[in-house]
A protein has these predicted regions:
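Channel- or pocket-lining gating/hinge segments that regulate access to a cavity or pore
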Residues: 178-180
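C-terminal binding/interaction regions
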Residues: 172
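Feature captures the catalytic cores and cofactor-binding loops of soluble hydro-lyases/lyases
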Residues: 1-168, 182-228
Length: 228
């Protein structure tokens, strides 16, 4: 039902930082350079945790006191386990400004047990010490002290968080720099492109750090075709 990549590719991607992933994607010219990633408003709450990679599971939340029936947590859990592991939760908060936090110690533990590696939300999070100790990554717009009346409004639909529209099953990577989507058609080629770009950039870096640096040499290095 959902497209996947190999375990080897997942492992390789999880060892690469977000900026290098984005540079590599640019090298394949599969999308405009200003698309495919969440805006800086969605920040990594735990900048010391390693990159996480997973398949998106999407939903919509609100912390305003609801009227009528809200989405069942059981249905939400069923949706989560229908998506291949590892899972990357993406929740759009319809409250403006964001109010109560869906994410904290309990939800972090529940969703980690369900195979999720982290969450990206334009809402809020809390219980930071406990979530950090758990190793469950939070990418969020802000922090809130309360969960208020937080509840699920919709699940499994495309959502836009931080300017990035995400569908359930999309491949995402997040690290201390933010969150980016990874096109399936090039996912397995990204590690090699990362190495190619690193070799290209190394020429400039080594020149700038060398005792023989000169403006003429910098201009000469600048003539080397960019791989991205």
């Amino acid at each position: 039902m959902y497209e996947t990549v190999s375990q080897a590719t997942l492992k390789a991607l999880s060892g690469i930082d977000g900026p290098s992933i984005c540079n590599a994607i640019e090298g394949f010219k599969v999308r405009p350079k200003n698309l495919g990633f969440m805006l800086p408003e969605i920040r990594a709450i735990f900048s010391d945790l390693p990159p996480v990679v997973g398949y998106a599971v999407t939903g919509v939340i609100s912390a305003v006191q609801q009227e009528g029936r809200n989405v069942s947590r059981d249905d939400w859990y069923d949706l989560i386990v229908s998506v291949p592991e590892p899972r990357f939760i993406v929740l759009h908060d319809i409250d403006n400004p964001p109010l109560g936090a869906f994410w904290g110690e309990v939800q972090g533990n529940i969703h980690k047990a369900l195979g999720a590696v982290g969450v990206a939300t334009d809402g809020t999070v809390r219980d930071l010490d406990e979530a950090h100790e758990l190793g469950f990554q939070f990418f969020a717009k802000d922090v809130s002290v309360s969960h208020a009346y937080v509840h699920l409004v919709e699940i499994g639909i495309p959502v836009t968080v931080g300017g990035l529209t995400v569908s359930t099953g999309d491949l995402l990577l997040g690290d201390k720099h933010g969150v980016t989507s990874i096109p399936f058609e090039i996912a397995d080629k990204i590690p090699e492109m990362v190495s190619t770009i690193a070799a290209f950039e190394k020429k400039t870096i080594e020149l700038c750090q060398s005792a023989s640096f000169s403006l003429d040499k910098l201009k000469e290095v600048g003539k080397i075709p960019r791989p991205y």
